[in-house]
């Protein structure tokens, strides 16, 4: 059983939107600031985006996604694509952004995916922080090596990653920007 997918998980995410709003807004503000400073030299016109670990885009902003000519989402959850289209489809269409949702593990064949989309920007949404859970706790060197190799694989390409620091209540308030 995967606790980060399935209809129950999405129902809980939908019900938690108000509680997540400050985090979603902080992510949107950060992404929009990055967009202002970002102009990839290898891309003419509007760039395309590969959104890996998209889920239903619960923490993503339609405004930020709409700056891309085309958005391809990738998630292993079979409900993710349908719900992503429900959440962002109309807004992206109104902004002239093509949306293509894929049910697959993009991390398994990332080099081929990057070859297929040579000029696309890449954004990892709650994916890279989970790599450590795919290995025994004492294999931290393997995890570190995988993440270092990812930097090499993505060299020369615009890319980014976000992973929420806490998924649940905390004992103390965590100041925005302290991550």
Ranges and model annotations:
Residues 44-57, 157-179:
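Conserved class I S-adenosyl-L-methionine
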Residues 119-138:
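A short SAM/SAH-binding and catalytic strip from SAM-dependent methyltransferases
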Residues 77:
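Conserved SAM/SAH-binding beta-strand->alpha-helix loop
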Residues 1-44:
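Class I SAM-dependent methyltransferase Rossmann-like catalytic core
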Residues 115-117, 137-159:
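A short glycine-rich, Lys/Arg-flanked "PGG" loop and its adjoining helix->strand segment in the class I
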Residues 55-68:
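Conserved SAM-binding loop of SAM-dependent methyltransferases across substrates and taxa
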């Amino acid at each position: 059983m995967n606790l980060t997918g399935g209809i129950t998980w999405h129902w809980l995410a939908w019900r938690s939107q108000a509680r997540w709003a400050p985090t979603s807004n902080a992510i949107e503000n950060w992404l929009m600031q990055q967009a202002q400073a970002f102009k990839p030299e290898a891309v003419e016109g509007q760039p395309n985006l590969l959104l890996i670990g998209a889920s239903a885009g619960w923490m993503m902003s339609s405004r930020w996604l709409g700056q891309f000519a085309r958005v391809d989402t990738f998630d292993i959850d079979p409900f993710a694509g349908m719900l992503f289209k429900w959440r962002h489809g109309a807004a992206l269409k109104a902004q002239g952004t093509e949306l293509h949702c894929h049910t697959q593990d993009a991390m398994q064949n990332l080099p081929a995916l990057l070859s297929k989309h040579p000029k696309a920007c890449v954004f990892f949404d709650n994916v890279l922080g989970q790599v450590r859970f795919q290995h025994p706790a004492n294999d931290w060197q393997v995890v570190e090596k995988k993440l270092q190799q990812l930097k090499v694989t993505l060299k020369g390409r615009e890319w980014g990653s976000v992973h929420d620091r806490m998924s649940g209540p905390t004992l103390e308030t965590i100041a925005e920007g302290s991550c």
